[in-house]
Amino acid sequence: MAVPKGSLWLRAQLGIPPLLLLAMALAGGSGTASAEAFDSVLGDTASCHRACQLTYPLHTYPKEEELYACQRGCRLFSICQFVDDGIDLNRTKLECESACTEAYSQSDEQYACHLGCQNQLPYAELRQEQLMSLMPKMHLLFPLTLVRSFWSDMVDSAQSFITSSWTFYLQADDGKIVIFQSKPEIQYAPQLEQEPTNLKDSSLSKMSYLQMRSSQAHRNYLEDGESDGFLRCLSLNSGWILTVTLVLSVMVLLWICCATVATAVEQYVPSEKLSIYGDLEFMNEQKLNRYPASSLVVVRSKAEDHEEAGPLPAKVNLAHSEI
């Protein structure tokens, strides 16, 4: 069963402050084993313990209670820092001093415990700075370097794809097309042969032999370079050619889009606004003259009062009208 995190649950269940409970656990059990077990989690307090030993040496303070109280203050500060996740060290120090006040009733032991809390504070700040320095930080130029690496990878892959194979199309006399495809073959200049190991040869013969081989290698290299100079230049500069082609393609596409938008017919037809003064505005636009009020003739008719419809015709029985 997992124990809930937080000091409120411990106070409610046990009625003992959690920091005091942890300090009692560290002091009551095997001191060395428990300290080694918690050092990896709570941090190293050896420097604080040495400071306490220098402050309370046994030859000056025969009683060991004050020394133990100071060392326990170091441990209490580490526990408080672990509980608070090291957010505010000043608050951690206040909690450590409060735990010392609850743990000890003697003023000397309380002072020694408070001194242990104070001694552990600079070491905790140093450890926190070291942890912050270990955190990875992103440089401002990291996006640019990422884009550059992506672009270089894309260019290299395209270059390797282009130079992966050579394809030749030949048309025979009967009209058939023959396709030759093969991987590019790299020709290296022939290496100079090793000098003869015969000790009887003179140095002059060695020099003439080397000059002859070097001139032959240079001549072969020039002949090969003249034969496939264009293809070699294309393969070496394919990266720049591909880059320029892509940039020009993007520029052409942008120009086409802008030209299309500029010359396109407007598809949006603005809706006409309705107004209660539409007739008046129409007359003003057409410059029509209004009729004066005196030229209007109003004709009124008198309605007859109490005018009723005539009586209905009498009903005739058709059976009595037979002849």
From Swiss-Prot:
<dbReference type="GO" id="GO:0006914">
    <property type="term" value="P:autophagy"/>
</dbReference>
<comment type="similarity">
    <text>Belongs to the TMEM59 family.</text>
</comment>
<dbReference type="GO" id="GO:0005764">
    <property type="term" value="C:lysosome"/>
</dbReference>
<dbReference type="GO" id="GO:0005765">
    <property type="term" value="C:lysosomal membrane"/>
</dbReference>
<keyword id="KW-0967">Endosome</keyword>
<feature type="short sequence motif" description="ATG16L1-binding motif">
    <location>
        <begin position="263"/>
        <end position="281"/>
    </location>
</feature>
<keyword id="KW-0333">Golgi apparatus</keyword>
<dbReference type="Pfam" id="PF12280">
    <property type="entry name" value="BSMAP"/>
</dbReference>
<keyword id="KW-0072">Autophagy</keyword>
<keyword id="KW-1133">Transmembrane helix</keyword>
<dbReference type="GO" id="GO:0010508">
    <property type="term" value="P:positive regulation of autophagy"/>
</dbReference>
<keyword id="KW-1003">Cell membrane</keyword>
<keyword id="KW-0812">Transmembrane</keyword>
<keyword id="KW-0472">Membrane</keyword>
<protein>
    <recommendedName>
        <fullName>Transmembrane protein 59</fullName>
    </recommendedName>
</protein>
<dbReference type="GO" id="GO:0005886">
    <property type="term" value="C:plasma membrane"/>
</dbReference>
<keyword id="KW-0732">Signal</keyword>
<feature type="topological domain" description="Cytoplasmic">
    <location>
        <begin position="260"/>
        <end position="323"/>
    </location>
</feature>
<comment type="subunit">
    <text>Interacts with ATG16L1 (via WD repeats).</text>
</comment>
<dbReference type="GO" id="GO:0005770">
    <property type="term" value="C:late endosome"/>
</dbReference>
<feature type="transmembrane region" description="Helical">
    <location>
        <begin position="239"/>
        <end position="259"/>
    </location>
</feature>
<feature type="glycosylation site" description="N-linked (GlcNAc...) asparagine">
    <location>
        <position position="90"/>
    </location>
</feature>
<feature type="signal peptide">
    <location>
        <begin position="1"/>
        <end position="35"/>
    </location>
</feature>
<dbReference type="InterPro" id="IPR022065">
    <property type="entry name" value="Uncharacterised_TMEM59"/>
</dbReference>
<comment type="function">
    <text>Acts as a regulator of autophagy in response to S.aureus infection by promoting activation of LC3 (MAP1LC3A, MAP1LC3B or MAP1LC3C). Acts by interacting with ATG16L1, leading to promote a functional complex between LC3 and ATG16L1 and promoting LC3 lipidation and subsequent activation of autophagy. Modulates the O-glycosylation and complex N-glycosylation steps occurring during the Golgi maturation of several proteins such as APP, BACE1, SEAP or PRNP. Inhibits APP transport to the cell surface and further shedding.</text>
</comment>
<keyword id="KW-0325">Glycoprotein</keyword>
<dbReference type="GO" id="GO:0000139">
    <property type="term" value="C:Golgi membrane"/>
</dbReference>
<keyword id="KW-0458">Lysosome</keyword>
<feature type="topological domain" description="Extracellular">
    <location>
        <begin position="36"/>
        <end position="238"/>
    </location>
</feature>
<dbReference type="GO" id="GO:0031902">
    <property type="term" value="C:late endosome membrane"/>
</dbReference>
